[in-house]
């Protein structure tokens, strides 16, 4: 795992850091950029590592203090037996912010990281936030995502966990990616144990938990989605007083990679015009 992450180029001055959570778990993050600059904290999705945000680390670490977080059971963080539920995952983000000196941050959550970020807000409020960026997951708004059941008929042959994860990783992209990179992502994702991975896919809270959280946020919000969540983005834009939304129609789930230049430009504009001029 560590070898895989070392194969990816790191931003100049990027360093591996660790901290202990309030329940005694050692978690990892990548740190880059000037410590005195505004801090961006990137939270990855289900089973994904911090280094999936490498393009953002490279792009923003010249002018911003960039943190890419490995949640518990992911990347180079410890793999405890418990804590794979929203309250603990939100508390882990709170512990990370405390480890960074209790500074205010721009929190950027992608996929499951959206829910973990909203869990943090639900329990801790927005007092430590400069802004909130949420990428391609439901925020509890209407309409609820539609999940299509498997059509009737013979079940397809069962495949192993490695093949399933490899297929999942490749499904995140609409644009071609290097096979070595995809293999590294798959290898890293498989580090999350099956029981923990399953728990992360079934958080025991109602949809209103996420919706209640996002409507308590008074700081600027940027919500970027792919077309399946366009209606949620439209409703959030209409109902929330401090939100920007966008739909990336040609991107896969990992839109910050598939359309990295567009995303980095949009995030930079959000930082300059909404977050840092409050």
Regions found by a protein language model. Name each.
Residues 22, 30, 68-108, 112, ...:
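Active-site loop/oxyanion-hole signature of alpha/beta-hydrolase fold enzymes
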Residues 47, 71-75, 114, 139, ...:
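Alpha/beta-hydrolase active-site loop signature
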Residues 118-123, 127-160:
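Flexible "cap/lid" loop of the alpha/beta hydrolase fold
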Residues 251-264:
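Catalytic histidine-centered segment of alpha/beta-hydrolase-like enzymes
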Residues 143-149, 156-214:
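Conserved alpha/beta-hydrolase catalytic His-Asp/Glu region
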């Amino acid at each position: 795992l560590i070898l895989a992450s070392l194969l990816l180029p790191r931003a100049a001055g990027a360093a591996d850091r660790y901290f202990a959570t309030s329940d005694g778990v050692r978690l990892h993050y990548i740190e880059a950029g000037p410590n005195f600059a505004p801090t961006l904290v990137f939270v990855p999705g289900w089973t994904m590592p911090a280094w999936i945000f490498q393009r953002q680390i490279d792009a923003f670490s010249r002018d911003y203090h960039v943190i890419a977080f490995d949640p518990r059971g992911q990347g180079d963080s410890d793999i405890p037996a418990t804590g794979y539920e929203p309250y603990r995952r939100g508390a882990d983000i709170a512990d990370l912010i405390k480890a960074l000196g209790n500074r205010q941050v721009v929190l950027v959550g992608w996929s499951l990281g959206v829910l973990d970020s909203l869990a943090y807000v639900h329990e801790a409020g927005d007092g430590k936030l400069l802004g909130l960026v949420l990428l391609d997951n439901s925020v509890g708004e209407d309409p609820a995502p539609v999940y299509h059941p498997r059509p009737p008929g013979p079940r397809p042959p069962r495949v192993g966990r490695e093949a399933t994860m490899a297929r999942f990783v490749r499904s995140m992209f609409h644009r071609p990616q290097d096979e070595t990179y995809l293999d590294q992502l798959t290898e890293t994702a498989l580090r999350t144990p099956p029981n923990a991975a399953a728990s992360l896919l079934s958080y025991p809270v109602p949809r209103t938990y996420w919706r209640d959280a996002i409507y308590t946020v008074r700081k600027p919000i940027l919500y970027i989605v792919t077309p399946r969540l366009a209606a949620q983005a439209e409703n959030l834009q209409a109902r929330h007083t401090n939100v920007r939304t966008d739909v990336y129609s040609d991107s896969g789930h990992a839109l910050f990679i598939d359309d990295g230049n567009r995303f980095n430009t949009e995030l930079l504009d959000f930082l300059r015009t909404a977050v840092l001029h409050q």
